[in-house]
Amino acid sequence: MKFFTTGLLATAALAAAQEQQVLQAEDGMGRAPLPDSSIFDETLQKFQSSLEDGISHFWSEMKTNFKDYLPLISLPKKHTRRPDSEWDHVVRGADIESVWVQGADGEKRREIDGKLHNYDLRVKAVDPGVKQYSGYLDDNDADKHLFYWFFESRNDPKNDPVVLWLNGGPGCSSLTGLFLELGPATIDKNLKVVSNPYSWNSNASVIFLDQPVNVGFSYSGSSVSDTVAAGKDVYALLTLFFKQFPEYATQDFHISGESYAGHYIPVFAAEILSHKNTNINLKSALIGNGLTDPLTQYPQYRPMACGEGGYPAVLDQGTCRSMDNSLERCLSLIETCYSSESAWVCVPAAMYCNSAILAPYQQTGMNPYDVRTKCEDMASLCYPQLNAITEWLNQKPVMQALGVEVESYESCNSGINRDFLFHGDWMKPYHRLVPSVLEKIPVLIYAGDADFICNWLGNKAWTEALEWPGHKKFAETKLEDLKIVDNKNKGKKIGQVKSSGNFTFMRIFGAGHMVPLNQPEASLEFLNRWLRGEWH
């Protein structure tokens, strides 16, 4: 779903460490201590001596305030694996890996690249009324099982493109994106399924993937705690899926997502593009309200919260000045993280910056995903409709129809969010992969302009600052009006757009963090035009 601030900001507030321990005890997450908590002390002592004073002091604070918190791990989800006989198809990665062909140079090579022998794909037809499949990608060596749900295009599935959708968090299920934003249906307060006329599968087939493991209906006996580790799983999923359904493999493929997918997508796209012989016809990448380059994006939080992003100020002048005063240290920590990419410096950067720069907004009670509204229900990430979606997905008949193997569904897993944070993933410079991606495919960065947490000012700033061969021309290109051209509202302004070479940025008017939720017509409009090749 979205950039998962709840657990992060609670963790970031060092002054409220004791309260945080109480909150974590009450959140229902199963946790178990490491065999020997003294390991943390010993490891910390070894590394502290080599760290600069500010960072060393931070880890001393962490040791005091989070002594019992840091060494905790999430327990695996309870699950029951269904026998292969209950699935309509089982695709073996080992079978794909064993196929060799003769190349144009006369040399033998594998038909499809990549380490696939440890993966299987299980497939189940869900509903004959709407062609859809669900199932699991299994990494048998690592005991990882990723849940996916595929919906065929409503229009022309034999020719329409295929889109992969990824929610962020990290730790939020893509099924919230399915039912809250852009899927073929939503769930009302009476748990009734309601059709969505603006679904992204209007002119494309769409795959929703719960990743990393232990998110949504996915599960594992282990965990994934950084973005890079998840990339190979996504490559395997797509390879095995298109092998089972070659009719979709010939179509254009696009990878899309929002929020922390600003981390995921550069890595996943680079992983796919690194393989020469593949059945994935990757044509573009789309990131909505993403976090991609923290060093460039964090300076834009104060302007967005203080009335310079097109909406009234949420914070008072004193708080805005305090954020300005904290920014220099925040950026210094991020720069150190960018230089080393070590958790020992990237974690302090995330903890300090989120406490000093993000927490003041969070403490107002306003919705961090939409500066225009109060947060109605923090437990449901400010969107009470999530409660109905979660309740519907937890119904036994629904889980049975989908082939689900876990006992329950939750929209976001705070343990995953914490794991990524404490492995230093949050502040890492994944934007550095974007230039190599731009060499091969177009990239669209779009942003609802009412979002605070991954705001349009920050996304515009990092796209204009990115160093790539087309940097100067893109940075100098002015924003132009983005208008509807595809329906009866032709001529209606829905935002602004700038594009040069393979790079495009869009500001979408009147949308928060989740553009398809707030502006469904505009969302489908720009998606359809992007998939047709406009702006690239």
Swiss-Prot record:
GO BP terms: proteolysis
Family the UniProt entry places it in: Belongs to the peptidase S10 family.
Positions of the propeptide removed during maturation: 18-124
Top-level EC class as recorded in UniProt: hydrolase
PANTHER family membership: SERINE CARBOXYPEPTIDASE CTSA-4.1, SERINE PROTEASE FAMILY S10 SERINE CARBOXYPEPTIDASE
Organism: Trichophyton rubrum (Athlete's foot fungus)
EC number, as in UniProt: 3.4.16.5
Leader peptide range in chain numbering: 1-17
Residue positions the entry lists as glycosylated: 203, 502
Protein name, UniProt field: Carboxypeptidase Y homolog A
Gene Ontology cellular component annotations, sorted alphabetically: fungal-type vacuole
Catalytic function, reaction form: Release of a C-terminal amino acid with broad specificity
